[in-house]
């Protein structure tokens, strides 16, 4: 008679949880390996991308890839099984490799930020030294400092520890592979692996943000100066002929209608964001009578002025041309002219004041239209810069701060040990930073995006036969 085993609801829930946990860990490990390997492939196939900043990002990808290949597979099996199922000697190697790769990854983040900080704050002095040799020194310093922290227990520090890395629980039936239970080493490793590089990272990115903000402020100021002087002056000078044409109508009512029409056109142009810094183009044709001696009247002469005014617009199709052709009789010196000179000067003065007020209004509207676009571009760039810095620091802090807080707290508070599931979640939250780094440090790099697109979309070219 065969006995059948029926799973209880508790067993089914536990099995489902294990399956989901194993699937999530498997996908995380797979993505960490794939994404960081992709960074290497792109850098290898594109020599143009092998610059100092990209080499530092490549070293970051190498440390994350090493974590994904060596540490994460063992850690995932350990998390699913709930105990250390590998040989005892492998426990020390696992812990040392974990500290080495995690520390190198964190320090690489700081070095990438430090390189950007030097390039922005000391461009002349640093750019002369920013070469592959400098990048090699920085990369070597990262791995040396990480090795001094991770290999310290193997070099004799663990001899003073009360318990080794591998401990036995539940009547010596369950083995657990843990970090070295030694307060001095805990402080040493946490300080060197997290707190110092974190402070350095926040400092350099804060300075980068300050330098970025000052640069944008100076750029806006220079744009304002350009708008206030050269561009505005050229625009006003180029439209003098067009503005003077408003003096010619003798009817005040007609001049008022023309003025209101121009105001409405200028307002509509600014509201639609069409103002731009293009210079107005003036074409002036002064036409003289060919047969002046024959056609000139004894009492009057005719002078014709034709002006073509192209207003400053942002789109070609918005070019505004106005042909103004006025014939003004100029009386010769006579008694009638002398009597009418004073009223004419009065009319001209009134018309000139109207034109002057209208020109001042147009100048203010034009100035605002030119200033609006640089401010919008500056604000967009500043928001993007702040967004990138926020993502870098935010992801790093969210991923690693809980782990190192728990790491130090548990060492000095034995009763503060979290639940096994919470401890596993916090540990893997730190590991997940290695899966995010390839996205954060490459998605905002346009050159990398282009190279990555070419890597997946480029077709194989037919091989050309070489002549022997």
From Swiss-Prot:
Biased composition (Acidic residues): 255-265, 281-292
GO molecular function annotations of the record: G protein-coupled amine receptor activity
Membrane topology, record value: Multi-pass membrane protein
Tissue expr: Expressed in the pharyngeal neurons, MCL/R and NSML/R and the AS group of amphidial sensory neurons, ASEL/R, AGSL/R, ASHL/R and ASIL/R.
Keyword Phosphoprotein tagged: no
Subcellular locations according to the entry: Cell membrane
Any one GO cellular component localisation term in the record: plasma membrane
SUPFAM superfamilies for this protein: Family A G protein-coupled receptor-like
Transmembrane stretches, start-end: 24-43, 55-77, 92-114, 135-157, 187-209, 388-410, 425-444
Region described as Disordered: 252-306
Extracellular-side positions: 1-23, 78-91, 158-186, 411-424
Residues bearing glycans: 171
UniProt cross-references to SMART domains, sorted A to Z: 7TM_GPCR_Srsx
Purpose: G-protein coupled receptor for tyramine, a known neurotransmitter and neuromodulator and direct precursor of octopamine. Expression in amphidial sensory neurons suggests a role in chemosensation.
Database matches in PANTHER family: ADRENERGIC RECEPTOR-RELATED G-PROTEIN COUPLED RECEPTOR (PTHR24248), TYRAMINE RECEPTOR TYRA-2 (PTHR24248:SF151)
Family under the similarity heading: Belongs to the G-protein coupled receptor 1 family.
Name this polypeptide is given: Tyramine receptor tyra-2
Name of the coding gene: tyra-2
């Amino acid at each position: 008679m065969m006995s059948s085993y029926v799973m209880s609801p508790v067993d089914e829930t536990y099995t489902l949880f294990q399956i989901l946990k194993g699937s999530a860990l498997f996908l995380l490990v797979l993505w960490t390996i794939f994404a960081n390997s992709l960074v290497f492939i792109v850098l290898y196939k594109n020599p143009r991308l092998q610059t100092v900043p990209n080499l530092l990002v490549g070293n970051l990808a190498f440390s994350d890839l090493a974590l994904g290949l060596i540490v994460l597979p063992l850690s995932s099996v350990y998390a699913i099984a709930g105990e250390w199922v590998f040989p005892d000697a492998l426990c020390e190697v696992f812990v040392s490799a974990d500290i080495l790769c995690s520390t190198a990854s964190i320090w690489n983040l700081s070095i990438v930020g430090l390189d950007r900080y030097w390039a922005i704050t000391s461009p002349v002095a640093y750019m002369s030294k920013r070469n592959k040799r400098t990048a090699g020194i920085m990369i070597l310093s990262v791995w040396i400092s990480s090795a001094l922290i991770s290999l310290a227990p193997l070099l004799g520090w663990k001899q003073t520890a009360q318990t080794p890395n591998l401990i036995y629980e539940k009547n010596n039936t369950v083995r657990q592979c843990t970090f070295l239970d030694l307060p001095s080493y805990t402080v040493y490793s946490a300080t060197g692996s997290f707190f110092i590089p974190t402070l350095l990272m926040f400092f350099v990115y804060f300075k980068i943000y300050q330098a970025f903000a000052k640069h944008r402020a100076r750029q806006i100021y220079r744009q304002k100066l350009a708008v206030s002087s050269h561009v505005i002056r050229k625009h006003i000078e180029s439209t003098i002929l067009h503005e003077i044409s408003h003096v010619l109508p003798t009817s005040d009512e007609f001049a008022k209608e023309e003025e209101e029409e121009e105001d409405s056109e200028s307002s509509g142009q600014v509201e639609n964001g069409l103002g731009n810094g293009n210079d107005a183009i003036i074409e002036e044709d002064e036409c003289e009578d060919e047969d002046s001696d024959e056609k000139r009247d004894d009492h009057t002469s005719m002078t014709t002025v034709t002006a073509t005014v192209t207003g400053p617009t942002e789109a070609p199709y918005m070019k505004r041309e106005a042909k103004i052709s006025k014939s003004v009789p100029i009386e010769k010196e006579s008694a009638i002219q002398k009597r009418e000179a004073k009223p004419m000067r009065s009319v001209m003065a009134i018309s000139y004041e109207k034109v002057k007020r209208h020109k001042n209004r147009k100048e203010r509207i034009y100035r605002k239209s030119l200033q609006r676009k640089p401010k919008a571009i500056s604000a967009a760039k500043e928001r993007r810069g702040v967004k990138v810095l926020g993502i870098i620091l935010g992801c790093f802090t969210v991923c690693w701060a809980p782990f190192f807080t728990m790491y130090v707290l548990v060492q000095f508070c034995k009763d503060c040990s979290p639940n096994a599931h919470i401890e596993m979640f916090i540990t893997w939250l730190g590991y997940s930073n290695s899966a995010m780094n390839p996205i954060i440090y490459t998605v905002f790099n346009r050159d990398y995006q282009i190279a990555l697109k070419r890597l997946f979309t480029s077709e194989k070219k037919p091989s050309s036969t070489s002549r022997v």
